[in-house]
Curated annotation (Swiss-Prot):
One of its GO terms (biological process) is regulation of DNA-templated transcription. Gene3D superfamilies: Winged helix-like DNA-binding domain superfamily/Winged helix DNA-binding domain (1.10.10.10). Keywords: DNA-binding, Transcription, Transcription regulation. It comes from Bacillus subtilis (strain 168). The keyword DNA-binding applies. This is Uncharacterized HTH-type transcriptional regulator YuzN. The keyword Iron-sulfur does not apply. Residues 37-61 bind DNA. One of its GO terms (molecular function) is DNA-binding transcription factor activity. Residues 1-92 form the HTH arsR-type domain. NCBIfam families: HTH_metalloreg. InterPro entries: ArsR-like_HTH, HTH_ArsR_DNA-bd_dom, HTH_MetalResp_TranReg, WH-like_DNA-bd_sf, WH_DNA-bd_sf.
Length: 92
């Protein structure tokens, strides 16, 4: 679990990744294109889809983002279970 904790804290340690999680938690399912457009327009970020894909890789390694195929698109989904499990020991 320590490795997973480290991965979660690493993922949360970057402000862009936190914005990605904010958007995914707000909208539930987004494609990479939709996520990119939201980040650029809502937060005035200067970021490419490739850079977001790298951030998503870190979030996926931590278990905070999953994806599934919907037709020809890959949809991104926020998974808050790792955060709940991490905090459970401290809060209870």
């Amino acid at each position: 679990m320590n490795g997973n904790k480290d991965a979660i804290f690493k993922a949360l340690g970057d402000s862009t990744r936190r914005l990605i999680l904010d958007e995914l938690s707000e909208r539930n399912e987004l494609t990479l294109y939709e996520l990119t457009i939201r980040l650029i327009t809502k937060y005035d970020l200067s970021i490419t889809r490739q850079a977001i894909a790298k951030h998503l890789s870190v979030l996926e390694d931590a278990g905070l983002v999953t994806s599934k195929r919907k037709g020809k698109y890959r949809v991104l989904i926020f998974n808050n279970e790792p955060l709940k499990n991490l905090l459970k020991g401290w809060i209870e």
